[in-house]
Amino acid sequence: MRKDERERDAPAMRSPPPPPASAASPPESLRNGYVKSCVSPLRQDPPRSFFFHLCRFCNVEPPAASLRAGARLSLGVLAAFVLAALLGARPERWAAAAAGLRTLLSACSLSLSPLFSIACAFFFLTCFLTRAQRGPGRGAGSWWLLALPACCYLGDFAAWQWWSWLRGEPAAAGRLCLVLSCVGLLTLAPRVRLRHGVLVLLFAGLVWWVSFSGLGALPPALRPLLSCLVGGAGCLLALGLDHFFHVRGASPPPRSASTAEEKVPVIRPRRRSSCVSLGESAAGYYGSGKMFRRPSLPCISREQMILWDWDLKQWCKPHYQNSGGGNGVDLSVLNEARNMVSDLLIDPSLPPQVISSLRSISSLMGAFSGSCRPKINSFTPFPGFYPCSEVEDPVEKGDRKLHKGLSGRTSFPTPQLRRSSGASSLLTNEHCSRWDRSSGKRSYQELSVSSHGCHLNGPFSSNLFTIPKQRSSSVSLTHHAGLRRAGALPSHSLLNSSSHVPVSAGSLTNRSPIGFPDTTDFLTKPNIILHRSLGSVSSAADFHQYLRNSDSNLCSSCGHQILKYVSTCEPDGTDHPSEKSGEEDSSVFSKEPLNIVETQEEETMKKACRELFLEGDSHLMEEAQQPNIDQEVSLDPMLVEDYDSLIEKMNNWNFQIFELVEKMGEKSGRILSQVMYTLFQDTGLLETFKIPTQEFMNYFRALENGYRDIPYHNRVHATDVLHAVWYLTTRPIPGLPQIHNNHETETKADSDGRLGSGQIAYISSKSCCIPDMSYGCLSSNIPALELMALYVAAAMHDYDHPGRTNAFLVATNAPQAVLYNDRSVLENHHAASAWNLYLSRPEYNFLLNLDHMEFKRFRFLVIEAILATDLKKHFDFLAEFNAKANDVNSNGIEWSSENDRLLVCQVCIKLADINGPAKDRDLHLRWTEGIVNEFYEQGDEEAALGLPISPFMDRSSPQLAKLQESFITHIVGPLCNSYDAAGLLPGQWIETEEGDDTESDDDDDDDDGDGGEELDSDDEETEDNLNPKPQRRKGRRRIFCQLMHHLTENHKIWKEIIEEEEEKCKAEGNKLQVDNASLPQADEIQVIEEADEEEEQMFE
């Protein structure tokens, strides 16, 4: 019985009956993501024949059934006629016909291929011209093509029959001209396009030549007739296909729409984005009314958007909460209502009945809020990246709106903002959604202070900033085990902290080494906090205790010392709820009724606490501005004692750095840090950015220890590059327009020691002054932050250099090459390793007084400057710099543009990195010796690995002169010329008389002429580029640049050495040629002797 019922109900289940037309929207239980609709059934394809596949192969649409039936009937009639003719003939006729057929077949077998080629040529030409003139489709504008074969061959046939002088072989050219004339007249009739007419003429000449040369087996009179016949057949076939068949590219003929009876009812999934989920009708469900959908909209229904909006509001709160009973009430709205009721209770003019009612409502809402428990947020929203804010007055924060939790570019809804009725003067501090590195989102109980009976968020909450408790490592590990990013550095977590014991208020906990967060940290690390600067303490005693504690909290992005904030103790004798709430504001009213007396006491308490807070803040700022005397004492005495002598040695382009290294002896390992400290003192960068000396020296000593003891790319090279960028940016430059004067570079700072908003600091060297207004200086046109980034980049630019080139690392699949995808491998490694060192320990944080935006800008500039030292990108930078600074159509360098200043700094560090050939001869040879030894070490390793030895790195065949000459000619020379042409090289004006100037010009011309007699044209051009004529200013003034002078002299010396080597090689070659005259006999004897020795060894 059950089986019969199931069989009877099965059809109803497969095709449920449609609902009545008058039915309203279906019940909510049926709206489960599926709708009833009707679809057209799939039709079975008809059987395919050979003719159908042939049409598909020819790219045409198969004909209709009626056309196919007529074609079959015609073929049948033709076959019957042929069969009847054969049956009615006599046997004798069959024999004669067979003999004639054999003769015809023997002749046609030799002519079949040319005839078929002619037919195909006419077929494809007709198809092309037909569709090119009209496009695909039916029409009657191309039937003139049927006359084309006749014009090609019938004219030739007539000339052959009636003009006997055209029958010889030499008259073939005349017959071809006759054919082309006939075809040309034919193309004029239908107004063929010019290119099509030319194509037809070329085609006619080609097919005539095929007929003339390929049909030699046929009689001469029969050749044009058969050619015309097959050509006409090809044209006719092409026109027939174009007339009776459709091209597949054309739109097919419209088909009749399916009737309602052909549709089958089905149940299908509903397209969520094409329905109005909160007000759709039955017609939309059953497919009777179409709802057009914009294809650009996301497939998300309105219910999903509402749920998403609500969930996102919860995620963006500092504490993700919801009611335990699952009632789905937004606690932020509930707490807003409680705040508004509490504000109304303060009004003394309200009647007692209203006050009683309001107190009852507040108690009910407080009881409901107290029953809610927080839930762990398993999602990590992206709150944006806020800069570190400075010390703010809590009173001023009360009327300020929260930061938006999400970027304005996205389409996500923003969290609900705090609203206040303004009926009371209570503080309404609003805490933004923050991210904590150590503990993620903490509960209020964990952040409160258990001693002294403190409670949280009562009506008398003062919301002062104190020191939070430290969460144990086991809790942090348990809570964030699944949320940490795979492969993250362990230093980015507080699990390595040595202190895990809760401390009392006013003390600080240990902090792990700082890290540099990026945007991915906010998505993968929910425990990152965006903090407040240090400056918010509850008392002066707490502040001094903090200064004595070395384990201070540091910002992970800008290095500021910070204090995390929690609520403090409340006055005794007041009951407060201990439960948490989901309100973003930290001032949540309790369930107990309030009165006016308590409110006045609260205001008095808040004023007292605020005065204490501001007092502690002032002490903090005073102490932060005072220099740390103990740290200065711990520094190396050499930094202070030899400052004057060291800066005097460095005030020269030819800084004798190797003599300084020998003088320092065992302390030469600290040359980079000492020179860096000296330069920062000279330029005033230590005072401008409030750089602590101890952290500064700690970092740069660790940085120079990371340089390897290799011949060239060591700490001495880094120090030389640092000196070069300092010299190029602080020495006087003739004719450079100076944007900021010396008195304008000293910017005034605020009372806290920081620059005011909108002010830009500029520096100047204490060891050098600008002689007059005809000189300028790069330090007056480039802000101090950018120059400091340039100096730091020079110190970092070859950190942890392995002594091998990028090409070697790529060829050997080194880990760095794999990590950086073979692009600027060493430069990326230097920058990343140097910044990793800076972020590894808090005692390296010498940039702690930079705000967030300054630090981000500084880091960007340092990385860009280091990456610019890649010689593979040398010519790209050179072309860009020439287009900006030296192009006649360019406006020159705009010092107000950050991009132009960045380009100047990049070219400056590039020039400093390869400044060896621009030094005097002794320094240049010392640097050349270092780079050559490093090259030879790489060549030895390449030979050991079986790799081809790179150019100039083979120790067995030294080419020192060619290496340096090529390096100067192609790399250093063009860069220095471009930098000099832009007017950025330091130098001095030289007063000369007209006669002296003329003589110097003549001497230069003579020198160039003498050199041109011995060198080729390329060397002459290079020599002219490296020997620029003295630039005359104001008639009798020219510029002398020490850098260009040394570069020119070194280049001349290397060229002379190359010439001497070439002459020596030529002399040795001539000697070898003279000696080789008697060598053949000796060679033969030597070969015979070797053969005899081999035979003796074989016999032995």
Curated annotation (Swiss-Prot):
Residues 627-1061 form the PDEase domain. PROSITE patterns: PDEASE_I_1 (PS00126), PDEASE_I_2 (PS51845). Its cofactor is Mg(2+); Mn(2+). Residues 1044-1079 form a coiled coil. The chain crosses the membrane at residues 69-89, 110-130, 140-160, 170-190, 198-218, 225-245. Mg(2+) 2 binds at D798. Residues 415-439 are annotated as: Interaction with PIK3R6. GO terms for biological process: angiogenesis; cellular response to insulin stimulus; endocrine pancreas development; glucose homeostasis; negative regulation of angiogenesis; regulation of insulin secretion; signal transduction. This is cGMP-inhibited 3',5'-cyclic phosphodiesterase 3B. It comes from Mus musculus (Mouse).
